[in-house]
Amino acid sequence: MHTNYDVCRMAELNASQLNLSDQEVLFETGEQNGIPAGIGRVGNLPEAMTLEDTARYVKERMGIPEVIVYGDAGTEVRRAAVSGGSGRSVVGSAAAKKAQVLITGDMDYHTATDAVAGGMCVIDAGHYGTEYCFIRDVAEQLRKEVPFCEIREAAVRHPYYVI
C-alpha cells in the first residue's frame, strides 16, 4: 500500500500542502485514465522567495519542527519539486524539470551536496515530516467509504528529536 499511495496520492497531497501551482508529475511510473502518474510533483510556489524563507514556509505548511537546508540561504526559488519520503532517487528528475529546490526527506549528505553543486537547492523535511499527513488523509477517505465503522487516527508523534 505504501508505494501505491506514494504514486496515487502522496505527491498531490504534499504539493497541495505547499500550494504548488502548474503542477506536473516529477517522475512518471505509468498513467491513470490517460493521465501521467508517478512519484513526486513539480510546480511553482505561490511566490518567489529566498531559500531560507522557503524552508520556513515548508516547516509551517507541513507542520514540522525543523528542516535541513542545502544551498545558499539567499538563493531565490520559485519552481519546486516535492517528493514525500526518501527523495534521493528523484534528484535527476527534479533537475531535468528545472526545479530550483527539491523538498523531500531522507536526503543523504553526498546526494544533497551534489544537487547543490549542480545548481539545485535541497530541503530535507524528513521522511516522517513529508508523510505523516497520510494518516489524516486515509482516515478521511475511510470515513467516506465505510461510514458505519469508527475510524481512529493515530496521534502524530515524530519518531525522533534533535538535541
Model-predicted regions and their roles:
Residues 1-163:
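Hydrophobic structural segments
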